[in-house]
Amino acid sequence: MIITVNSPIASRLDKYLRRLYPLLTQGVIEKALRQKQIIVNSKKAEASLRVVEGDEIFIHDKFNLPIAQPTKLVFTDAEITLAKKITTEYLIYEDDNIIAINKPAGLATQGGSKINLSVDSALKYLNSQGADFKLVHRLDKETSGLLLIAKNYVSSVKLHDAFKEKLVEKTYLAVTYGKPIKDQGEVKTNIEKSKGSIPKITDINDNNGKLAITYYKLLKSLTNNLFLVEFIPITGRMHQLRLHAKLLGCPIFGDNKYGNDKLMPYSKYMFLHANNIVLSKKVFGKEVNLEAKLPSYFNRV
């Protein structure tokens, strides 16, 4: 059997094969390559070989490909309802490459322990209906605002690379409890995430953490020691803005993880909103500048 690679994005041979045949294990692929039961362009290949569009992967007849039997996917009414909202009520932008939604606070981006409903589970329903949506980045469950979703594999690779190469600029608006130590500036720390624990700030020279940089600007004073602050993350570490806000002496209002429980008044919501995203022209050939409307509860403060 000959498989002609049809993806314009270069990919490792082993990863390409496992996308086509999810039941293939890494060990089986490498053994088949050693025995020349799988070759590329009539030559012996390594698992790390990057295949591109037009390459021919030959799989010997003696090699038994593990084919997964199709299973019937079952979706809950909540997942189907959420899927409809993603393509209507939450949708704020769509082109050939991406959609952008205004994710409400309280909705998880991905599933996990004790999470039964998420954007990802709704996308799986849409994909079962013929779409090919792929998550590329995430927002915390408590954070509202702009979430970009790729419409196909090629777009997902381009978008993933864009985040990595800093071709995506994100701006967040937050209501903080307390005023930042300066009206504007830069926060630069390391953030360490250990398995089973929440992220924490560490010294900039700590080799265990990863560099985290955030620009911030005080926009206005509100009331009752509340302030509107703009945050621009240069890096994308887990809980980065929440940790940096706390470090600045102004935890995000409603943040029950990093806020000051003894001083900060109770709030049902965490007031952190992904307000604006700008995609460089280099990503899809045109600049995309998107803005997500603030949730109504922001108006109450």
Swiss-Prot record:
Residues 11-70 form the S4 RNA-binding domain. The active site is at D140. SUPFAM superfamilies: Alpha-L RNA-binding motif, Pseudouridine synthase. Keywords: Isomerase, RNA-binding, rRNA processing. GO terms for biological process: enzyme-directed rRNA pseudouridine synthesis. It is an enzyme of class 5 (isomerase). PANTHER family: MITOCHONDRIAL RNA PSEUDOURIDINE SYNTHASE (PTHR21600), PSEUDOURIDYLATE SYNTHASE RPUSD4, MITOCHONDRIAL (PTHR21600:SF83). This is Ribosomal large subunit pseudouridine synthase C. It comes from Rickettsia bellii (strain RML369-C). The lineage of its organism: Bacteria, Pseudomonadati, Pseudomonadota, Alphaproteobacteria, Rickettsiales. The gene is rluC.
